[in-house]
Swiss-Prot record:
Tissue: Mostly expressed in roots and stems, present in siliques and seedlings, and weakly observed in petioles, leaves and flowers.
Family matches, as Pfam families: ZF-HD_dimer
Name of the protein: Mini zinc finger protein 1
Function noted in UniProt: Inhibits zinc finger homeodomain (ZHD) transcription factors, such as ZHD5, by interacting with them to prevent both their nuclear localization and their DNA-binding properties. Involved in integrating signals from multiple hormones by preventing the expression of genes involved in gibberellic acid (GA), auxin and brassinosteroid signaling and by promoting the expression of abscisic acid (ABA)-responsive genes. Regulates several development aspects, including photomorphogenesis, apical dominance, longevity, flower morphology and fertility, as well as root and stem elongation.
Quaternary structure, from the entry: Homo- and heterodimers. Interacts with ZHD1, ZHD5, ZHD6, ZHD7, ZHD8, ZHD10 and ZHD13.
Superkingdom, natural source: Eukaryota
Biological-process GO terms, alphabetical: negative regulation of DNA binding; negative regulation of DNA-templated transcription; photomorphogenesis; regulation of meristem development; response to abscisic acid; response to auxin; response to brassinosteroid; response to cytokinin
InterPro entries, sorted: ZF_HD_homeobox_Cys/His_dimer
Biased segments, Low complexity type: 14-32
Listed GO CC annotations: cytoplasm; nucleus
Compartments reported by the entry: Cytoplasm
Protein backbone atom coordinates (compact mmCIF):
# COMPACT_ATOMS: atom_id res chain seq x y z
CA UNK A 1 0.00 0.00 0.00
CA UNK A 2 1.45 3.33 -1.06
CA UNK A 3 1.02 6.39 1.17
CA UNK A 4 1.09 9.87 -0.24
CA UNK A 5 1.53 13.08 1.69
CA UNK A 6 -0.11 16.33 0.73
CA UNK A 7 0.69 19.67 2.39
CA UNK A 8 -1.36 22.83 2.19
CA UNK A 9 0.02 26.00 3.77
CA UNK A 10 -2.34 28.88 4.52
CA UNK A 11 -1.38 32.31 5.76
CA UNK A 12 -3.89 34.57 7.45
CA UNK A 13 -3.51 38.09 8.71
CA UNK A 14 -5.67 39.59 11.45
CA UNK A 15 -6.44 42.58 9.18
CA UNK A 16 -7.43 40.42 6.24
CA UNK A 17 -11.03 40.67 5.08
CA UNK A 18 -10.85 37.62 2.85
CA UNK A 19 -11.33 34.09 3.97
CA UNK A 20 -10.62 30.89 2.17
CA UNK A 21 -11.61 27.35 2.84
CA UNK A 22 -10.92 23.99 1.29
CA UNK A 23 -12.22 20.48 1.53
CA UNK A 24 -10.43 17.27 0.76
CA UNK A 25 -12.23 14.00 0.23
CA UNK A 26 -10.53 10.67 -0.06
CA UNK A 27 -11.29 7.03 0.63
CA UNK A 28 -8.93 6.73 3.59
CA UNK A 29 -7.26 9.89 4.80
CA UNK A 30 -6.11 11.51 7.98
CA UNK A 31 -5.07 15.09 8.45
CA UNK A 32 -3.58 17.30 11.11
CA UNK A 33 -3.30 21.06 11.37
CA UNK A 34 -0.32 22.93 12.76
CA UNK A 35 -0.60 26.67 13.48
CA UNK A 36 2.28 29.04 14.03
CA UNK A 37 1.47 32.54 15.35
CA UNK A 38 3.85 35.46 14.84
CA UNK A 39 3.45 39.10 15.81
CA UNK A 40 5.12 41.37 13.28
CA UNK A 41 5.25 45.16 12.81
CA UNK A 42 3.88 47.47 15.49
CA UNK A 43 0.83 49.45 14.38
CA UNK A 44 0.40 51.70 17.40
CA UNK A 45 -0.35 55.28 16.36
CA UNK A 46 1.86 57.41 18.60
CA UNK A 47 0.44 60.69 17.23
CA UNK A 48 -3.27 59.89 17.70
CA UNK A 49 -3.68 62.41 20.53
CA UNK A 50 -2.68 65.30 18.20
CA UNK A 51 -4.68 64.04 15.23
CA UNK A 52 -1.73 62.67 13.28
CA UNK A 53 -0.39 59.29 12.34
CA UNK A 54 3.08 58.06 13.31
CA UNK A 55 4.37 54.55 14.00
CA UNK A 56 7.64 53.77 15.75
CA UNK A 57 9.05 51.42 13.10
CA UNK A 58 9.24 48.32 15.30
CA UNK A 59 9.25 45.40 12.85
CA UNK A 60 8.67 42.38 15.11
CA UNK A 61 7.38 41.67 18.61
CA UNK A 62 10.01 40.44 21.07
CA UNK A 63 8.69 39.50 24.51
CA UNK A 64 10.29 41.46 27.34
CA UNK A 65 9.85 38.60 29.82
CA UNK A 66 9.32 34.89 30.10
CA UNK A 67 5.98 33.29 29.23
CA UNK A 68 3.45 33.50 32.04
CA UNK A 69 4.56 36.92 33.30
CA UNK A 70 3.11 40.36 32.56
CA UNK A 71 6.30 41.31 30.70
CA UNK A 72 5.67 38.51 28.20
CA UNK A 73 2.96 40.70 26.64
CA UNK A 74 5.19 43.80 26.40
CA UNK A 75 7.56 44.29 23.45
CA UNK A 76 11.21 44.65 24.45
CA UNK A 77 11.93 46.77 21.35
CA UNK A 78 9.16 49.39 21.48
CA UNK A 79 7.46 48.90 24.88
CA UNK A 80 3.99 48.42 23.37
CA UNK A 81 1.52 45.67 24.27
CA UNK A 82 1.54 42.63 21.99
CA UNK A 83 -1.94 43.51 20.66
CA UNK A 84 -0.51 46.56 18.85
CA UNK A 85 1.58 44.23 16.68
CA UNK A 86 0.00 42.73 13.55
CA UNK A 87 -0.77 39.04 14.07
CA UNK A 88 0.13 36.52 11.37
CA UNK A 89 -1.09 32.95 11.59
CA UNK A 90 0.59 30.33 9.40
CA UNK A 91 -1.51 27.19 9.28
CA UNK A 92 -0.08 24.01 7.85
CA UNK A 93 -2.47 21.20 7.01
CA UNK A 94 -0.85 17.82 6.48
CA UNK A 95 -2.99 15.15 4.85
CA UNK A 96 -1.88 11.56 4.55
CA UNK A 97 -3.98 9.27 2.43
CA UNK A 98 -3.88 5.95 0.67
CA UNK A 99 -5.41 5.67 -2.80
CA UNK A 100 -8.21 3.12 -3.15
CA UNK A 101 -7.15 -0.28 -4.46
CA UNK A 102 -8.09 -0.73 -8.09
Amino acid sequence: MMKKRQMVIKQRSRNSNTSSSWTTTSSSSSSSEISNVRYVECQKNHAANIGGYAVDGCREFMAAGVEGTVDALRCAACGCHRNFHRKEVDTEVVCEYSPPNA
